[in-house]
């Protein structure tokens, strides 16, 4: 099974999750600025909400790499929202990519809100989530 990990982060919160998933699966995680060089069965894509949507950079990544994405598995952080799946699915659907029902999400630090998140427990949970998805 070919698996890839990509993420986009402004604060560093989602990168922490990407690194935890990377360590659990022994697969290098990259920023969305790095295109997929080959077909992936599963793409773990991490992002957060910015103005109640995913960043246009993430949307562009999905569209520009559509021919190399089998299925998307979302992960992410945010201070307020509880899922990245809906906005990612909206984009993926336009280019015919399936999005897994499985998703990992945790709180992320935003100013004084949710200090120290994601924390060690969140990172452990993200790693366990990734292992479960690829079993």
Regions found by a protein language model. Give the residues of each.
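Short amphipathic alpha-helix with an adjacent loop that forms part of the alpha/beta core around
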Residues: 33-39
